[in-house]
Amino acid sequence: MFLDTSFIVALEMARDNHHNSAIVYWKKYIQKPMPLVTTDLVFAEMVTFFNARGLHAKAVEVGDRLLSSQLIDIVTITPELRAEAWSMFKRHSDKRYSLADCASFVVMRKRRISRALTFDDHFVQAGMNVAPAP
């Protein structure tokens, strides 16, 4: 399963609109954990999100947890993956996908990952299954 920024933020921020859904889903997930995949761009987005809101300690705490987790594979976006993500970004001028979204979609397709932990509607628009279900 793919781990997106929006799920991490919802899980960590009590004020987030999706916080309760994230907590309920996470409690079920940790009973039967499975490997998660994310990207270094998602990691950077998450760190930037917290730090930009004056939550440097939270950025470090969550970042350290992700980096040390045996269940989370943080994929480095190589020049080849970046080129594919950039190509996808350019093709979808009708969408509001971020480059990080496009990189996530490319990694998911290459790794045959069909489900994402996310609250970002862009994943549904791109044809991915999402959890928790919208």
Located regions from the model:
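Acidic active-site catalytic centers that drive phospho-/nucleotidyl reactions
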Residues: 4, 45, 101, 120
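Active-site neighborhoods of divalent-metal-dependent phosphate/nucleic-acid chemistry enzymes
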Residues: 73-115
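Short acidic, glycine/proline-enriched helix-loop-strand junctions
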Residues: 66-78, 86, 92-94, 123-134
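A general alpha-helix detector
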Residues: 7-8, 45-46, 84
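Short glycine/serine- and small hydrophobic-enriched flexible loop segments
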Residues: 48-51, 109
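Acidic, PIN/NYN-like endoribonuclease modules and their adjacent C-terminal/linker elements
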Residues: 105-134
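Short, well-structured N-terminal submotif of metal-dependent ribonuclease cores
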Residues: 1-38, 51-63, 134
